[in-house]
Amino acid sequence: MKNIILITAACMLALLSTIGASLPYPILPPLFAADAPNAFNHFLGLPSKLLFGLALTINPLGLLIGSALLGPLSDRYGRRPLLMRTAVGAAIGHAITAWALVIQSYPLFIVARFITGLLEGNGAVARAMLADQLQGPLRLRAMSWLNGAFYLGWLVGPILAGATLAWGVTVPFWIAAGALMLVAVLVAAGLPREAPSLLTSSWWQVARDRHSLNLLRHEELRTLFIVQLALTCGVASFYEFYPLWLVETAHYNAQAIAWVNVGLCGSMTITSLLAGGPSRHAPLLRAGWYGCGIALAIGVLAMGNIWVGIAAIVLFGIPNALYNTVIQGWCAERFSAHGQGAVMGLLSTTFCIANIVVALGGSLLILIDTRLILVVGALCAAWSAWRMDGWRRHLHAADAAALKAAA
């Protein structure tokens, strides 16, 4: 029963973190496209498109910083207290966001969205919690279900916003705030109390000295970062630019793109719920296979017609979900000595960095042709899969030599 509550709490946190990030997507465009200028959409007389871009960017920026810091902080202060506090804090952040919309305060809205994103970077803590408390096949399945919850949030967020907007623009944020408060109660009930840490370092020292990127001082984790960054650059190129490909190839509108997104999120969610079982193949070998599948889907999208492209978009979700399940489970086993919070934080931070890199590079490449960024993304994913296979062979040889020396 405890495991059920534990996994449910982690999945609810994951679901609500991505719901929180995706809630504004259908809400903000009408606010900034309004014909009548107001204090919100023309703050300081700045162009509304500039304000809109900042409003969309600020929450993922908070997620990036939170992903790097919250995992290591949970290694120091414990998963339970940090998850409870970040859930309550994110709920308050959603409430302040709603209030900012009511009073049309753009600065308050930006601050609230940043802080909410920072606190919703607790996905690394949720992963570390499962890695700590569960073992073997159950751990892999729980990690897979957690990923499914993350994917589902990107689908549910815009749907929730669209379904409740009729009652007011602030209603979706109040619903998210209430749900997060319930999750905090679930965490309090489902997680056992942890023994107080004997360390005396302050939170600032932990944040400064033990953030996830400090793990790059270790050779194996440096290699992990490189292959993961290459693969997630491919994934980010797909996520960020397949909607533009649909617009340019078949003149899809927002509603048509949303239906394609439903298919993608559905394939990722279903695969995540079914994945995580035992396998006789080495984790890195399987990760390489799934990386090849990701590269193939992106490449087919770049080169195919509209129907082939839509099939590639939906099917992309299968290898992507399988890859994340395998690599997270393997990292939890291989690098547990470095702290599960820091390790899971490194994976989350890497994906955030990839999104920023691809957004900047892609904005230049699409000036020539949108397919270029997709081709580059496919090549990045293919290189990562190839490099992963070589790394697997190297680690196997090194582990065998270490066992022989120990004997």
Per-range role (PLM):
Residues M1-K2, P192-F225, A407:
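Juxtamembrane intracellular "pre-TM" segments in multi-pass secondary transporters
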Residues P26-K49, E240-A256:
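Short amphipathic helix-loop junctions that connect adjacent transmembrane helices
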Residues I65-G78, T271-P283, I366:
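Helix-to-loop junctions at the C-terminal end of transmembrane segments
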Residues V88-I103, G293-G304:
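C-terminal ends and interior cores of transmembrane alpha-helices
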Residues G93, Y106-G121, V308-L322:
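Hydrophobic core of transmembrane alpha-helices in multi-pass small-molecule transporters
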Residues A112-F150:
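Cytoplasmic helix-loop-helix junction between adjacent transmembrane helices
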Residues I257-S279:
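Transmembrane alpha-helices of Major Facilitator/SLC transporters
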Residues H338-L367:
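A late C-terminal transmembrane helix in Major Facilitator Superfamily
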